Regions:
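Glycine-/proline-rich flexible loop or hinge segments
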Residues: 14-18, 37-43, 51-55, 73-85
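Asp/Glu-centered strand-loop micro-motifs enriched in Gly/Pro and often flanked by an aromatic residue
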Residues: 1, 34, 45-46, 81-89
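N-terminal secretory/membrane-targeting segments
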Residues: 1-5, 22-25, 133-136
Length: 136
């Protein structure tokens, strides 16, 4: 079996690529610039709607909102049209780390938005933000 190279993804929510380029030109954020020079930087187009929870879910599933089922930080329950918070276990698509685990790979996933509550998989997952109660 061919050995696969490790993948490291550092996602910075809400950081526009032009701002990062300006910081690099101005000599600001040198550690981030060194990471980019050594490993490469890629920007991604946001999803529609342009909401962090939707964009991150689109990124980690490779599916659009109609396919993965998350359209925002809160939604309406189709049974009673009351507000509800979509949760990670309710997604209709698997994130890439679960797909990789099914092929025998190992993943460590830290603080990725829209991954609460964590669902079991053979790896480590520390859930990222979003609260699941409007009162909190």
């Amino acid at each position: 079996m061919k050995r696969r190279r490790p993948l490291f993804v550092l996602g910075i929510d809400g950081l526009p690529a032009p701002l990062l380029e300006r910081w690099k030109r101005e000599g600001r954020r040198p550690a981030l610039s060194r990471i980019g020079e050594r490993y490469g930087l890629r920007s991604m187009d946001s999803s529609l709607p342009e909401v962090s929870s939707v964009s991150w879910t689109t990124f980690f599933t490779g599916k659009n909102p109609g396919e993965h089922g998350l359209f925002g930080f809160y939604d309406l329950d189709p049974k009673g049209y009351t507000p509800r918070f979509p949760t990670f276990p309710g997604l209709s698509s698997k994130p890439f780390w679960e797909e990789e685990a099914a092929r025998g790979g190992r993943s460590v996933v830290l603080n990725v938005p829209s991954t609460y509550p964590a669902r079991p998989f053979p790896g480590e997952l520390v859930s990222g933000f979003v609260a699941t109660e409007m009162e909190k």
